[in-house]
Amino acid sequence: MLLDGTINKLDTTQNFFLKTIEGLEEKDGLFKPQDGMFSVAQHIAHTAQTVDWFIEGMYSKAFNTDFDALEKEVFAITSYEVALKWFNDAFERGRSKLRDEGEEALKVRLAPGPIMGGVPRYIVIGAISDHTAHHRGALAVYMRLLGKEPNMPYE
């Protein structure tokens, strides 16, 4: 039951994000409101990377805190399509990992530490959803700046 719920949460998180950004396309990938901000493609790439980061971290001894290296990986992404593939693949990897590890593994507490230390693993799925929603909202603003109407994700 817990496993099904966490997989369902990943599914709805992914689907809400994709529904919202449906009107974006490759030509929008490099758009950013100003220097120093993520582009459309980089927002999507960062969101994908963070899904992978959370899933890897929840089954490891600690989360990767080499944020400079993680940021460089995201800033290298310039294609909307490449970022979108990473996003979809990250969610599929997440679902596969949850299934492979099984329900009981979701109840195991994370090691003490600065990132979600001591919480049961399944709580991490809520953090994935929250983080993804944050970037979904940012991309909705970007879409409006591009003259596009973001979709209501819940339809």
Predicted regions and their residues:
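Generic secondary-structure transition motif, activating predominantly at the C-termini of alpha-helices
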Residues: 14, 25, 59-62, 91, ...
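Acidic/histidine-rich alpha-helical segments that form the ligand environment
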Residues: 20, 75-111, 119-136
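Short, contiguous alpha-helical
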Residues: 7-11, 18, 28-71, 112-155
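Surface-exposed helix-capping loop/turn segments at secondary-structure junctions
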Residues: 23-30, 97-107, 144-150
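Amphipathic, well-ordered alpha-helical segments in soluble domains
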Residues: 13-23, 50, 90-93
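Basic/polar N-terminal segments that are highly enriched at the extreme N-terminus
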Residues: 1-4
